[in-house]
Structure formats: structure tokens, C-alpha cells
Amino acid sequence: MPPPAEVTDPSHAPAVLHQLNEQRLRGLFCDVTLIAGDTKFPAHRSVLAASSPFFREALLASAPLPLPPVTGGSAPSPATTTAASSSSSSPPPASPHSSSPPRVLELPGVPAAAFSDVLNFIYSARLALPGGGGDGAAVAEIGALGRRLGISRLQGLGEGGDTWVPPAPTSMVTSDPTEDGLGAGPRTDGEWVGDKAEALTPDSQPRRPFPCPRCGKSFIHPKRLQTHEAQCRRGSNTRGSAGLGPGVSGSGGPAGVDASALPQPVGFRDGPEHVVKVVGGHVLYVCAACERSYVTLSSLKRHSNVHSWRRKYPCRYCEKVFALAEYRTKHEVWHTGERRYQCIFCWDTFVTYYNLKTHQRAFHGISPGLLASEKTPNGGYKPRLNTLKLYRLLPMRAAKRPYKTYSQGAPEAPLSPSLHTPAPAAMPASPQPLPPPAPEPGPPPSVITFAHPAPSVIVHGSSSSGAAGGGPAGTGGSQAASVITYTTPPRPPKKREYPPPPPEPTATPTSPASTAVSPATAAGPATATEEAKGRNLRAGRTLTYTAKPVGGLSGSGGSPTGTGRGSSQLQAPPPLCQITVRIGEEAIVKRRISETDLRPGELSGEEVEESEEEEEEEEEEDQEEQEESKAGGEDQLWRPYYSYKPKRKAGATAGGASGVSGLPRGRRPPRWRQKLERRGWEETPSVEGPGGRGRGERRHRCGDCAQAFATVRKLRKHQEAHSGGSHTSRTGRRSSTRFTCPHCAKVCKTAAALNRHGQRHAVERPGGTPTPVIAYSKGSIGTRPTDVKEEAPQEMQVSSSSGEAGSGSAAAAEASESASLQDPVISGGEEPPVAGGGSYVYPPVQEFPLALIGGSREPSAGKGKPGNEGSLGASEGDRMEGMGTAKVTFYPEPYPLVYGPQLLAAYPYNFSNLAALPVALNMVLPDEKGGGALPFLPGVFGYAVNPQAAPPTPPPPLPLPVSPKGIGGMTGVERTQKGDVG
């Protein structure tokens, strides 16, 4: 029988090796990553195992399935070998409990440059010595690495130059490379060390992927392995069972093989030792490398990875490896460009915290650094204990899971295919296996949570609609460092509120997490109540921070600049946000501004009554928030320069009450103009709304002053002013002084605000009805409204004559239509309306006039006493110049004064201190005893006359009786003009 013909190709083996090297360089079919130093090297496990016994043992130790056991004698028979090899070559059935082998193999203490040369030699069988072989240190380093890896051709390089690596065993490497690489030909006993070791390893349970290199104990999670390694203090001569079984020892191995000469298993080097110190009764763990102290041992272990070679977190996009996971996360952001830092005011996202901080300082007027630190006595800053994060850290998209997982530290059970494969829409709903139920220690969360913690999450606790999609879903976490809660009491939803932000990509409808939102909607305010019970709430001090929007209020579609992302897609700015921080508690996010205030346009089709009620609620809430910020002024670290109400421009008042003529078409007038239009006083015709009821109609009248109001809320607020401010204020707020407008139901907090508000009433009637002037006469005590005379509008004019001239000037007062000089002129009031069309009942007329300032003509009016020269002003001085000697008369007996709102409203001054008013009006200044003159009334109280009013028209002076002592001197108003008024 002729021998069989054979076909050989000497170039086949080099060609296959060349193709494998090309695949390695391109990253094709690489199933393991080798980490040497800070560099990653992709490779093929089969090539590494065929080239180096070190890699063969290491990869067998981390194989997912053990080799079949060998029964019988010390050496296997050829039949057993063939069966074992055939069974190992065939793919075994996948076990549900077997975990995938680790794809990362770390080489501690191996320099990256030397390992790169060795890996190139494995794949190409060529090695270019550094420096042409003249660099002895580099050659010795490669030789030491070759001895450690067991590569026979590299063991002789630089022999004796390095003693830190044990010599590789020569008996385990065959001379024929085809026997080890291709698996053909006779095998030596040394090649069965790994198989024998695997046979002695118990394989009743699945192999755990994280074994301890010292004691051999395996763990499921790498964190548990790190905790165990810190406590494991066995000797360095103890061999671990990670790579070899317990049967491999000095005498249990094959003949001629020393256990100490075997390559070291893959593991971690010993980390730096730590020092325990006790300082002030507290235990501190000090790092031996950098002497940094930590409170807990786990923090020190986490820090020790920086000093050791435990770089187990390789970048998924480049060749860098990091010691800590957060270092890798911060690095990978620059590859992916993810914007994880989200502003809680405008929901804009940024790549880094620095960009977010710059955005909040520039566009919202908020400095986050002031919230996280406080000043020290020596002028520095120290971190706060209870800091408020004004941002949310969103999870990474690459690491985000569509549903919450429940890890109990045991091998994970096989997940049902229905959780991995989305169900098509055409398939009918069928019961699917769900993960085990989550523990329920408290109320269910209203946002979809993930398995990893998040530093900040918004939990909607008071609004049921916010749970179903009001907040950004998918940004929460199972554990939150700072929780921002909606703890305001629930109120009926408004139709014109700003729409909720678009939710971020969340779970599929088939995931069980989507069903976790529905029970939160029924929780309602109970969620916030349950959360508040365990947080030790207290009514303490508050800090209010107001953030302005990113864009302007024009609503022209202009995109905000400088936000960092493509914000030009937003056609209108997001709503404003005000945050009230209670000391020691969470933040309360209040969005007070409705959509129509930020997006000018036409009104929607809602009812007029609802819109009025909404704006009244918003106005009341704005006033309460401003009171709260003023009451806690001493606690406020900073005040933003933005206010909710826009400032009126200089030309905004030219349009009158309507205010629509000067605005471009398609834009609504400002909010304060709309309120003035809707109020609709009685002299302006009522505007019919969509509901048929006039906006200007006032149905509720006050029983005390018969003033009409459009709503019951305004009437109650007005009645509280009559009762002396007996309304109950909120707990923890200071009582504020109320200043009620006499023309409408507006209640101001300060006198200056009331003065500015009063100017609006004067503005909306340009050249309108003259201001009625009420004049009371001494002789007409019993007169009623029929004796009231209306005069030309004027700001204020107080003039008088002596008491004897009261009856003599009656005829002159009737003949002239100007103001009477013998009676006080009280201007600025308005006759209040009366229900039922009846006449208004006036208060009783005073028996004596107010402080009267009179003057008479005298020939010698130019003389005066020295030291009394002064200046009253150009207009007032010229008016009083021709009046001659003047005199101020006060009455000694006190008389009943009516200084309520009716009298005070007549004066154009702001009487903030009412207690001093009756005392000033009852001051006595006898005529005959030569007392000092009373200063002019504005000089006494320091009240400023309304600057916008027209200067008063001086009436023609009437002859007054001459004072007995007024022949050669100046009295009365002249002395007042000269010296008493500054």
C-alpha cells in the first residue's frame, strides 16, 4: 500500500501569525485586554495561551467553564487525551449560572514599553532591540519580562541583570513550537499541570470571577474582594488558588517542577500600609504614602488605589486606565460630550460644573459658591454643613438602565427574554415575569429611579400631576444626597401655568418601572407629609433666592446667549424660579410666574373670572414672598438684582390708561397696565368680557366706607385695614405695616410704595376731572354736602386769616370762585361712591379749623429781626412776599380731630407716623404773647410734596387784621420763610 500523499505549506504558519497580528492591531476579534502600566493592549487569548505558560495558567484560572475531570492514574492515556481534547474543543452548552470571563487582565509591575516589545515578538516572531542592543537596561528589562512570562527565546536577554523576577520553568516549554501552538505531536508531562490542577479543583459550583490572590477565596463583586484583601494578612509564600488548585504544591506538581519556580498568579500587589491615629477621641486612618487622613477605613482603601497599580477602570474610547471609577467617568465625558450638570432653574445642561456655575452667575444672578461656603472670622471661607445644590447630576447615558435592578450580592438569576427584547405593538398583552418586588419602607417615589445613586433629585410630593410627567424623568436615584421637594400646600391647577418640561428618555412601557409612577399620583400631599415627619422640620429662618430667566421677557424668539448648548431651539424663555431655603431643611422650589407673563401674545379662551382670581393669587403670593425676604434680611447672604415686576419705562405713561397705542401689534401691554385696565373705576365704562359680565363691575361694597370692590378677597383685605390689621399672619413672619390706597383696594407695605401707586391713578386720567376741594367754614357748622365748593385742582394750599376776619370775608368768598383764604383747603380727596344712589354722609365738621397761616399787608413789612433770614423757596417766597406780615394761630383747647383715612388722604403727604399728627395740630401759639412762629407744615414733618403736580395757583390775598406787635417786626410766615425752613 503506497503511503498517503501529503501537501505541506511552509508559509502557512507565518501567514496565519501575520493575519493574527493584523487583527490585533485593528482590534478585530480581540477577546482580552492586557493592562501594563497605564496602557491597554488588546490581544487574543488563544495566541497568548499558546505562546506563554504564564498566560495559559492565568487564562485557565479565569475561564468560565472548567476542563473535564481526569480519572485514573498520574498520566492520561492517549484515548483519554483525545477525548478530553475533543470535548474541550467542542462548545459546551451554556450554563445559566456561568458568568462571562473577565476581559481585562492586569499585569502589575510590568512596564508598558517592555511589554509592547514582547507582545510584538509573540505575534510576529521578531524583536527589535532598543538602541540596537546597546541599551543594556532596556534589554535586561525585556529579558526579565521574558523569563517571567516563560518565553524561552527571550529568557537569555540580559541574563542576571534583574533579580526581581523568578526564572521561568524550562521544563514546561517544548522545543517544537508546533507541539505547543497547534496541539499536535507527543506531549510532555509538564504540559498537563494545568489540566491536572483543574481536575483537582472542585467544580460542583460555578466559578466566581474575583478570587483573592493570597488565600484563594473568591468573591462576586470586586468591592468585596478589595475589602477582603485589606484584612487578609497571610504570608507571601502562601500560594493562592486563583490560578492553580490546592493540589499543586512543592511535591504535588509534576516531576522536576518546583512550585516556587512556577509563574506567579495574576493578582494585585500589596497596597501601602496605613497608620491608625486617635486624635481627640476620633480614630483617623492615615495613608502611608501621602499622609492623608480619613475617618473611615473604606475611604482609605478607596484612596489607596491611587498609589497602587490597581488600575481596573480602562477608558472605553482610548488607551487610558484609571484607578477610580469617577476618574474614568470624568474622562469619558470628554469623549461622549454628555451634559450631565443640569441647572434647576432653566433645565439647561452643561458638560462641567464650571460651565454650570458660570451660567448661573451670569444668567440667574446666583453665585453657588456662597451657598457652599461661609466666611470665617479671619476672612477666609469654610465649607457649609448643609449646602444646597442648585444643580442635578444626570446619570450617564452609557451606564443608564431602563429599569431598577435589585442586587442582593448573589449570582444573578437568568433574566427573562421579555425584559431584554421589547414586545412588538401587535402582540397582545400577556403576563410577563417581573423582578422581585422592591422593599417599601415609605411612600413610593414619584420619579423613575435607577440602581445607581444620584447626588440630587427632585421629588414631586404635593402635585399629583407632576408625578405623571411634570418633572424630568429619569434623573432620579435610589439614594439622594440633597432632595428638592415640592412641600407647598396643594392648590387647584391653573390653566395658564407654564407647561411641564419635556421628559427625558425613560423606560419602555413594558418595563416595570413605568408602573411605579401610578401609585405616586394617588399619594398626593401625603408623600410630602410622610417625608416631612422624618426630617425633623422646624420653623426656622429662611433664605430666599430669586433667579431670573435665561432669555429676555420680549418673547421675540431670541435665543439666550452663552448657555453652552443649542438653546436657539427654544422659542420662549422658561419660567422664573424662586427658591426659599429653610435652614437645616430642604429647598422649596416655587414657580410663581405664569406662562402669559413670559410669552406675550393673545389671551387663551379661559374665563375672565378665573384669570382674575389667578392674578389675584399671584399678586398676593408675590407680596408675601417679598415680605418674607424683607423679614429675613439679616439672614440673607446676598440679594439678586432681579425683581419679578418689570420697571416702567419713562415713556410708558404717555399712553394713558389704555397703554396699548404705543405698543407694536401682536404684543400685550405690561402686566401692571392690564390690571389697571381690568379694575375699571366707575368713571370708565365697563368692558364686556367673553362671559357677558363687565370687567369694571363692582358688586361688593364695604359697610364702613361704602367703597366697592370687584372680588370678595379685595373686600376682605380692605375690611382688615378698617379693623386695624387684625388679620392673622403666617407663622414665623414679622407683622408689616399696611398702607391702603384710598382710591382702590391696593395695600402697600411702605409709604413710598403707596406714593408711587397713587401716581398711577393720576397718570391714567390725563387732564381728566378736576380734583374736588372740600372747604369747611367756621360759620357753617351745620352745613352739609350742599355747601361744598369745587375749586381748581391744586396740590396743597394752606392759608388762613385771624379769627376776627372770618365773618367779614364771607362776601368776598362768595363773589370769587378761587380758594377761600379764611378756610383750610383740603385737596386731593375724592368723593367715595355710595351704594343705592344715596348721598354720602360726611364726618362731622370741625369746630375750629386746622393750623391757619395768614398774613396782612403792612407798610413796614421789610424790617425784621436779625438772625431770622432764610429762604422758603422761589415759588413759595414770591407768593408770600406780597402778603405782608403773617401770623400762625393755634387754639389752646383740644378739639375733636378727624384724622382717619378720610382726612389723611386729602393731604398730598405720606403720613407714616400717625402718632405725632394730633400733637402737632394741637400746638399752642398765642397771638399776643410773642411766641415763636410754627414752621411750615412740610418743614415740621419732612414730607415731600408730589413733584409731578402742577404748582399751585396763588389766590388773590385778602386784607387781614394787623397784629398788635407787627408794626416794626416780622411775624408769622415771614419769619418762617426767613429762618425756620431749610
Swiss-Prot record:
A zinc finger (C2H2-type) spans 210-232, 285-307, 313-335, 341-364, 700-722, 739-761. Pfam families: BTB, zf-C2H2. Residues 74-89, 478-488, 507-529, 799-820 have a biased composition (Low complexity). The modification Phosphoserine is found at residue 367. Residues 604-627 have a biased composition (Acidic residues). GO terms for molecular function: DNA-binding transcription repressor activity, RNA polymerase II-specific; methyl-CpG binding; methyl-CpNpG binding; protein homodimerization activity; protein kinase binding; RNA polymerase II transcription regulatory region sequence-specific DNA binding; zinc ion binding. Keywords: Chromosome, Coiled coil, DNA-binding, Isopeptide bond, Metal-binding, Nucleus, Phosphoprotein, Repeat, Repressor, Transcription, Transcription regulation, Ubl conjugation, Zinc, Zinc-finger. Phosphorylated by HIPK2. This phosphorylation reduces stability and triggers ZBTB4 protein degradation in response to DNA damage. Residues 71-103, 234-255, 404-578, 591-700, 715-738, 759-839, 854-880 are annotated as: Disordered. There is a cross-link at residues 40, 548, 590 (Glycyl lysine isopeptide (Lys-Gly) (interchain with G-Cter in SUMO2)). Residues 165-324 are annotated as: Interaction with CBFA2T3. One of its GO terms (cellular component) is nuclear body. Expressed in adult and aged myogenic satellite cells. It is found in: Nucleus; Chromosome. Residues 591-600, 628-637 have a biased composition (Basic and acidic residues). Residues 30-131 form the BTB domain. GO terms for biological process: DNA damage response. The modification Phosphothreonine is found at residues 769, 771, 953. InterPro entries: BTB/POZ_dom, SKP1/BTB/POZ_sf, Znf_C2H2_sf, Znf_C2H2_type, ZnFinger_BTB_dom_contain. Transmembrane segments: none annotated. Residues 430-446 have a biased composition (Pro residues). Residues 242-255, 467-477, 552-565 have a biased composition (Gly residues). Interacts with HIPK2. Interacts with CBFA2T3. Interacts with ZBTB38. Transcriptional repressor with bimodal DNA-binding specificity. Represses transcription in a methyl-CpG-dependent manner. Binds with a higher affinity to methylated CpG dinucleotides in the consensus sequence 5'-CGCG-3' but can also bind to the non-methylated consensus sequence 5'-CTGCNA-3' also known as the consensus kaiso binding site (KBS). Can also bind specifically to a single methyl-CpG pair and can bind hemimethylated DNA but with a lower affinity compared to methylated DNA. Plays a role in postnatal myogenesis, may be involved in the regulation of satellite cells self-renewal. This is Zinc finger and BTB domain-containing protein 4. It comes from Mus musculus.
